[in-house]
Amino acid sequence: MSAFTPASEVLLRHSDDFEQSRILFAGDLQDDLPARLDTAASRAHTQQFHHWQVLSCQMGDNARFSLVATANDVADCDTLIYYWPKNKPEAQFQLMNLLSLLPVGTDIFVVGENRSGVRSAEQMLADYAPLNKVDSARRCGLYFGRLEKQPVFDADKFWGEYSVDGLTVKTLPGVFSRDGLDVGSQLLLSTLTPHTKGKVLDVGCGAGVLSVAFARHSPKIRLTLCDVSAPAVEASRATLAANGVEGEVFASNVFSEVKGCFDMIISNPPFHDGMQTSLDAAQTLIRGAVRHLNSGGELRIVANAFLPYPDVLDETFGFHEVIAQTGRFKVYRAIMTRQAKKG
């Protein structure tokens, strides 16, 4: 998070307008502009743990990470700068939450890439903070309005639910595969052996569907789940509870908060961070797995077939095997051996 995103570059064209403002930054915070922009005061709220890690180093307690913002998170702010995410329901959850807390009269700026659908902010906020487009550059739009009416926000109304083979999956806006089990995860699930035992870590757990499906036919596994996304962490906790499955769930930037070693690490790693393509998380997962696998333990991941993971697996573990594949996806398996440890 050093180079500015196109959305931040558009905001910088108006930097003089923010010098006397007390700003709350929120939404898809892909860089550290909240810490660097010259303002009277700055706060940031994010649902992404890895974004909070970067911002908290520079902003301290003025950077907050949670599913739902509180009054303390927006205290004394007179301006909201909201970075539009690629997921419209996620934007609605976050904006209704924030606008329910900010006082009437707050200046509202919404910025985002055109391809993210930022123009739909006008309709979404029409009843609360009518927006006008004030700038267009770098394939982004910047919108401005003033809060005229606070919405009523109820986080419980944003929960969704679906069933997979008799399992209940709880979801929230912004969680991967919110509307159903994705094809890649289905392929990975098909490879999991019944009656498995030992400690299992689910990295990038999303709604927790991989873990509860695994636990159903391998009830003796001990589950740990982690994700960078606050909605994913809460959804996974709810999914485990709905299916009577025990497990520890917490926020982590891949392995940043993970302690100890496991007999198996499973993952359907992301290759996007917001609107940006990024293989960093998956490569960090593969390279870091050797520090969190017991001897003989395995890493098992599913990925789009075109992604360049075989080389990283071979560099890290000394070898890998493809244990299932379709035209679009492959399931990779790598075993923790002495050769991998030496690597």
UniProtKB/Swiss-Prot annotation:
Pfam families (UniProt xref): MTS, MTS_N
Keywords (A to Z) from UniProt: Cytoplasm, Methyltransferase, rRNA processing, S-adenosyl-L-methionine, Transferase
Family: Belongs to the methyltransferase superfamily. RsmC family.
Subunit structure: Monomer.
Keyword Cell cycle tagged: no
Catalytic activity field: guanosine(1207) in 16S rRNA + S-adenosyl-L-methionine = N(2)-methylguanosine(1207) in 16S rRNA + S-adenosyl-L-homocysteine + H(+)
Recorded superkingdom: Bacteria
EC top class, as a word: transferase
One GO MF term attached to the UniProt entry: 16S rRNA (guanine(1207)-N(2))-methyltransferase activity
KW S-adenosyl-L-methionine (keyword) present: yes
Name listed for the protein in its UniProt record: Ribosomal RNA small subunit methyltransferase C
Originating gene: rsmC
Cited function: Specifically methylates the guanine in position 1207 of 16S rRNA in the 30S particle.
Cross-referenced SUPFAM superfamilies: S-adenosyl-L-methionine-dependent methyltransferases (SSF53335)
UniProt-annotated location(s): Cytoplasm
HAMAP family for the chain: 16SrRNA_methyltr_C
